[in-house]
């Protein structure tokens, strides 16, 4: 579904256009395999916040194994958000973030792709949903052509912004 905007959409933009059925918000470089069928276990009170797997060659590698030098943990990274039915979130247009330029905290648009945005969203979602990370049951596959990263002007780490960690759960398919 397209969001009519001339800028990167905010999380609230995505939430506002959600409909009945399964709604998936994902980074543009994410794909799924047949394991996506396991989203059928989602209910209206649960959000799936999935940690990605890296596609290295022809092999899927867990997030934390693909980034060992960064000390990455799977609960600190989500690239996909799944909901059943209209998403019950409000006030997700802006967020407080640290400016790498000014060295101060300031309000910025709350968009996908800013370091820490997934953790801030996790904390917000926990106020309305049971948030689970069944990444062992639904493969969220990261297709990043190279490992170069664009420097970010802001980051959502520390300071006044609340973070949430969503650890992967090895939950039986019948109850994901």
Give residue spans per PLM region.
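A short acidic, often aromatic-flanked loop/helix-cap motif at beta-alpha or helix-coil junctions
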Residues: 3-9, 55-58, 139-141
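C-terminal catalytic/acceptor-binding lobe
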Residues: 94, 99-103, 107-176
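A structural signal for short, well-ordered beta-strand segments and their strand-loop junctions
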Residues: 23-25, 47-50, 130-137
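Active-site-proximal specificity loops/subdomain of glycosyltransferases
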Residues: 1-26, 31
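Conserved catalytic core of nucleotide-sugar-dependent glycosyltransferases
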Residues: 15, 30-123, 127
